[in-house]
């Protein structure tokens, strides 16, 4: 029985998946709601790691059999492209992506409140084509 803090468990998940939804508060809530062994010491919740991973991963899966799509808003798509662009590639503005998505039906997009949620993996080949046009 090895006890870990919620921050340690969060860092483990973040190391495997940068965009994970597991946060320190989520870890605490999961532990408290699912009856996972935990101890409170000096305002720190220590969680039994083996019990936690048994509850979170009951079938002991080691690998993903699927690829989780990168869902981003349009502004984040532009930011991610511009952050990871290669030398010689041009900056792409969010308005260019917005104009492209108005006429495109191949990229998954979903209006959520005031923002469009876009599948970045499907958008990436189109961004490469937009990059070649000047």
Model-derived regions: residue spans:
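Extended, non-core accessory segments
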Residues: 1-2, 7, 11, 76, ...
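Generic alpha-helical hydrophobic packing signal
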Residues: 3, 46, 52, 71, ...
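Polyanion-binding surface elements
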Residues: 1-26, 63-96
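Major-groove DNA-recognition helix of helix-turn-helix-type DNA-binding domains
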Residues: 16-46, 84-117
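A short, Lys/Arg-enriched interface patch at domain edges and termini
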Residues: 42, 50-70, 120-134
